[in-house]
């Protein structure tokens, strides 16, 4: 470790910034956030810095070239000029005076360096590459942004407010640690994140009253995992995935996403392959209730969005009947995510003014849909779970008025490295699929917007425009 990470209290302390340009302004704004008094030394300053001087009474400016006596009584110094000799002089003088000094973009002249900062005050996270690659440090910070929501600052304020009460309630440090670990990772934290301040305060007070390891009923997180690409997960989904005790998942959750769940969480697979459910839906509902009543934090992870053909509504109805706390986290539904990765806009001014989502499950070799409504012109049809019923689907759409030459596409495992796009028409698509076996999950898109696929496809996947021997896939 080349540097010792420390946090320096410079509130109401005098700090020197040498320089008057854009780089100096960035450092000054950072010092302002730490409530420092700032003394700027520079023969000339930028318009932006001039405006900052007018806005902030804690900034003063001396229109001179740097001299060592400018360092007198300063807590730290920052050299932010584009003149190497000036920067070297500031560094040498500060070192001689025993004052911490930072020279922007020159670690060799620094006695301290400025990290990339994630500010969730009073929580502060600093990331540093030791001056070797500031860009890499910023990239790492951006990853942390996804894992540490802004509400963590409020959570820290709550912890500070109750710290003395917790210390009085729990004599032994180990018990205090256990208490705070449960509070800061459980329902209390989620209440704070959701802005339910009174409920959070009541929950914490009740936990203190009980002062045992027995906590109230658990909670269920109904989370949409999106169409497959882990990068499409929401911040909230990622956070809840890391604090679950148990995860209940099905086939539509990709392995890459499942790998992001807390490693020591118990995993329960509930199937959801057509006609081969490992557990029927009623049993899944009952399992969620049972686990939550045991005090567990249960992650119900569903592909896509839990409220779009995901039966999420049925599950939370059962939870509500049993007074089980729950949260619902939306996910990017397959229609939106897969179409985007396939380069097929679902609406387009020249091609489609409406879009409809339907499920293509076969029942007794038929699909029960409002066919006249689906066969309207200037409309995009997105069919979930339609692979086995594609022949019936295309036949009915043609029978109810759509042209046989209407463009159609089927996308295999969209948004993942295994994505594959086949395009054709209502007339040709069943034969195309017959000749090119696909692996579920798949999504079917019907409408003139499919014509745009070849032009707009951007994701690195297999794309195969196809038709029959009599002609191209579509006009």
Swiss-Prot record:
InterPro entries linked to this entry: 4pyrrol_Mease, 4pyrrol_Methylase_sf, 4pyrrole_Mease_sub1, 4pyrrole_Mease_sub2, CobA/CysG_C, NAD(P)-bd_dom_sf, Siro_Cobalamin_biosynth, Sirohaem_synt_dimer_dom_sf
Segments for region (Uroporphyrinogen-III C-methyltransferase): 218-475
Functional pathway: Cofactor biosynthesis; adenosylcobalamin biosynthesis; precorrin-2 from uroporphyrinogen III: step 1/1; Cofactor biosynthesis; adenosylcobalamin biosynthesis; sirohydrochlorin from precorrin-2: step 1/1; Porphyrin-containing compound metabolism; siroheme biosynthesis; precorrin-2 from uroporphyrinogen III: step 1/1; Porphyrin-containing compound metabolism; siroheme biosynthesis; siroheme from sirohydrochlorin: step 1/1
Record-linked PROSITE patterns: SUMT_2
Gene3D superfamilies found in the cross-reference section: Cobalt-precorrin-4 Transmethylase, Domain 1, Methyltransferase, Cobalt-precorrin-4 Transmethylase, Domain 2, NAD(P)-binding Rossmann-like Domain, Sirohaem synthase, dimerisation domain, Siroheme synthase, domain 2
GO biological process: cobalamin biosynthetic process; methylation; siroheme biosynthetic process
Any one Gene Ontology molecular-function term assigned to this protein's record: uroporphyrin-III C-methyltransferase activity
Active site: 250, 272
Catalysed reactions listed for this entry: uroporphyrinogen III + 2 S-adenosyl-L-methionine = precorrin-2 + 2 S-adenosyl-L-homocysteine + H(+); precorrin-2 + NAD(+) = sirohydrochlorin + NADH + 2 H(+); siroheme + 2 H(+) = sirohydrochlorin + Fe(2+)
The organism's place on the tree of life at top rank: Bacteria
Positions bound to S-adenosyl-L-methionine: 227, 303-305, 308, 333-334, 385, 414
Entry's EC annotation: 2.1.1.107, 1.3.1.76, 4.99.1.4
Chain segments carrying region Precorrin-2 dehydrogenase /sirohydrochlorin ferrochelatase: 1-204
Keyword annotations from UniProtKB, A to Z: Cobalamin biosynthesis, Lyase, Methyltransferase, Multifunctional enzyme, NAD, Oxidoreductase, Phosphoprotein, Porphyrin biosynthesis, S-adenosyl-L-methionine, Transferase
Post-translational modification Phosphoserine, affected residues: 129
Binding positions for NAD(+) per the UniProt entry: 22-23, 43-44
Function summary: Then it catalyzes the NAD-dependent ring dehydrogenation of precorrin-2 to yield sirohydrochlorin. Finally, it catalyzes the ferrochelation of sirohydrochlorin to yield siroheme.
PANTHER family per record: SIROHEME SYNTHASE, SIROHEME SYNTHASE-RELATED
Family label: In the N-terminal section; belongs to the precorrin-2 dehydrogenase / sirohydrochlorin ferrochelatase family. In the C-terminal section; belongs to the precorrin methyltransferase family.
Name of the protein in question: Siroheme synthase
Species: Nitrosomonas europaea (strain ATCC 19718 / CIP 103999 / KCTC 2705 / NBRC 14298)
Phylogenetic placement of the source organism: Bacteria, Pseudomonadati, Pseudomonadota, Betaproteobacteria, Nitrosomonadales
């Amino acid at each position: 470790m080349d540097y010792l990470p420390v946090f320096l209290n410079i509130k109401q302390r005098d700090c020197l910034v040498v320089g008057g340009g854009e780089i100096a302004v960035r450092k000054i704004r950072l010092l302002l956030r730490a409530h420092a008094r700032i003394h700027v030394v520079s023969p000339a300053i930028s318009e932006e810095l001039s405006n900052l001087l007018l806005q902030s009474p804690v900034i003063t400016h001396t229109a001179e070239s740097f001299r060592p006596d400018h360092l007198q009584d300063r807590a730290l110094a920052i050299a932010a000029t584009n003149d190497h000799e000036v920067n070297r002089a500031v560094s040498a003088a500060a070192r001689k005076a025993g004052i911490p000094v930072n020279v922007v973009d020159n670690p060799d002249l620094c006695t301290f360096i400025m990290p990339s900062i994630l500010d969730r005050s009073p929580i502060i996270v600093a990331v540093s590459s030791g001056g070797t690659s500031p860009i890499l440090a910023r990239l790492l910070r951006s990853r942390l942004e996804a894992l540490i929501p802004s509400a963590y600052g409020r959570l820290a304020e709550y912890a500070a407010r109750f710290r003395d009460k917790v210390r009085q309630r729990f004599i032994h440090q180990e018990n205090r640690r256990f208490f705070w670990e449960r509070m800061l990772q459980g329902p209390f934290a989620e209440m704070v994140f959701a802005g339910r301040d009174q409920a959070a305060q009541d929950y914490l007070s009740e936990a203190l009253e009980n002062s045992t390891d027995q906590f109230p009923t658990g909670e269920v997180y109904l989370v949409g995992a999106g169409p497959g690409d882990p990068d499409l997960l929401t911040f909230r989904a990622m956070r809840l995935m890391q604090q679950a005790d148990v995860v209940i998942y099905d086939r539509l959750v990709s392995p890459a996403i499942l790998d992001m769940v807390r490693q020591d969480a118990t995993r329960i697979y509930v199937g959801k392959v057509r006609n081969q459910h490992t557990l029927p839906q009623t049993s899944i509902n009952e399992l969620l209730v049972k686990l939550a009543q045991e005090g567990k934090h249960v992650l119900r992870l569903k592909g896509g969005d839990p409220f779009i053909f995901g039966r999420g509504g049925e599950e939370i109805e059962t939870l509500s009947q049993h007074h089980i706390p729950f949260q619902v986290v939306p996910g990017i539904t397959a229609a939106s995510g897969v179409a985007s990765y396939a380069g097929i806009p679902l609406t387009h001014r020249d091609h489609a003014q409406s879009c409809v989502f339907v499920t293509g499950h076969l029942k007794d070799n038929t699909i029960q849909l409002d066919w006249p409504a689906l066969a309207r012109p200037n409309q995009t049809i997105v069919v979930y779970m339609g692979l086995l019923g594609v022949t019936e689907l295309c036949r009915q759409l043609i029978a109810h008025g759509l042209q046989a030459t209407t463009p159609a596409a089927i996308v295999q495992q969209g948004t993942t490295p295994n994505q594959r796009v086949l395009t054709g028409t209502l007339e040709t698509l069943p034969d195309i699929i017959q000749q090119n076996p696909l692996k579920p999950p798949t999504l079917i898109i019907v409408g003139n917007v499919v014509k745009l696929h070849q032009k707009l496809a951007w994701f690195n996947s297999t794309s195969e425009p196809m038709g029959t021997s009599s002609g191209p896939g579509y006009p």
